[in-house]
């Protein structure tokens, strides 16, 4: 890097490509002050509708079997270019995975301890657009109107979570993906409903702030939500219905992960999730027991009681 310090870095690709470019930017930033160099201009052009990395100061990089989250203001691109024609050829399975990642970003930013009026407004719009347009993208990738709406939703979700951060769905998904190479969006989709239920205290009083906010999302989706519990129930059903519509796996056991290997590495994944940088802003503070049970629920796909 010292011999060919760039003036411009362009990242053209999916979230992993943009995150890799961010790692380069981060490495350059460590030497820039001593060398008296300007930070390179950074242009991000996403070719999937998923991470929203083109507008965030986050980068996820893999070190051995662990995914590490970098957070630094230098990682925020200077220019983001959104072109829905670049995502028209994305296959249905990847469209589903990345689209559920968008939904997860919105849900987690919305109930984050760092949420604000600004991130809430973005997250609410994202949730509405995902349920309205993701199925159309999955059925017909050449539907550029649906593609544009999902591409915009991905970007808006990135804007929401770069300001509000995320929660334990991402913490658990980072560990699951790092250990068993489950695609990130798919890992989020497998864990999302279980975390929603746990954050809402669904099997308890179901009257947490998170439960009430989830119920508001259900109301915005024109689903039954006369009480927090009814709203959370509606949202959980809507999430599962969306996954089923796109033929997504219901449980980790449907993804090819070996049961014995899963049990053997469960404690390792829980430890990774506990120290993940997304965990502190989760609306409900988890411990190892809770995360272990959430993984076990996600293994079978059944939402059960978890304290």
Summary of predicted features, one role per range:
Residues 96-156, 160:
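C-terminal and late-domain segments of enzyme folds
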Residues 26-117, 208-219:
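A glycine/threonine-rich phosphate-anchoring loop and its flanking beta-alpha core
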Residues 16-23, 52-55, 169:
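Short glycine/serine/threonine-rich phosphate/pyrophosphate-binding segments
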Residues 261-307:
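Short, amphipathic C-terminal "tail helix"
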Residues 1-34, 136-147:
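N-terminal small/polar loop signature for handling phosphorylated ligands or for N-terminal nucleophile
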Residues 182, 186-264, 304-305:
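Gly/Pro-rich interdomain helix-loop hinge
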Residues 50, 155-188, 275-281:
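Glycine-rich phosphate/pyrophosphate-binding beta-alpha loops
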């Amino acid at each position: 890097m010292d011999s060919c310090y760039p003036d411009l870095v362009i990242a053209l690709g999916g979230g992993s490509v943009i995150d890799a470019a961010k790692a380069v930017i981060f490495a350059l930033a460590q030497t820039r002050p001593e060398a008296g160099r300007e930070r390179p201009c950074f242009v991000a052009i996403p070719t999937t509708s998923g991470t929203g990395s083109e507008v965030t100061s986050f980068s996820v990089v893999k070190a051995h079997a662990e995914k590490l989250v970098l957070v630094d203001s230098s990682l925020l691109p200077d220019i983001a270019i959104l072109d829905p024609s670049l995502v028209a050829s994305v296959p249905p399975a990847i469209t589903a995975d990345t689209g559920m990642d968008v939904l997860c970003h919105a849900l987690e930013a919305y109930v984050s301890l760092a949420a604000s009026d600004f991130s809430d407004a973005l997250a609410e719009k994202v949730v509405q657009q995902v349920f309205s347009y993701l199925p159309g993208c999955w059925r017909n990738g050449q539907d550029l109107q649906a593609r544009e709406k999902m591409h915009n939703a991905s970007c808006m979700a990135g804007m929401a979570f770069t300001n509000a951060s995320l929660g334990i769905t991402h913490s658990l998904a980072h560990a699951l993906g790092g250990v068993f190479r489950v695609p990130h969006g798919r890992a989020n989709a497998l864990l999302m409903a279980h975390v929603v239920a746990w954050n809402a205290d669904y099997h308890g009083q179901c009257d947490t702030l998170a439960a009430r906010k989830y119920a508001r999302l259900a109301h915005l989706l024109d689903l039954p939500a006369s009480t927090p519990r009814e709203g959370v129930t509606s949202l959980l059903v809507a999430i599962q219905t969306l996954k089923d519509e796109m033929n997504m796996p219901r449980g980790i056991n449907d993804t090819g992960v070996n049961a014995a290997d899963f049990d053997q590495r469960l404690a390792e994944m829980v430890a990774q999730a506990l120290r993940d940088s997304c965990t502190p802003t989760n609306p409900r503070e988890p411990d190892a027991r809770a995360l272990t049970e959430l993984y076990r629920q996600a293994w079978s796909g059944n939402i059960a009681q978890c304290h």
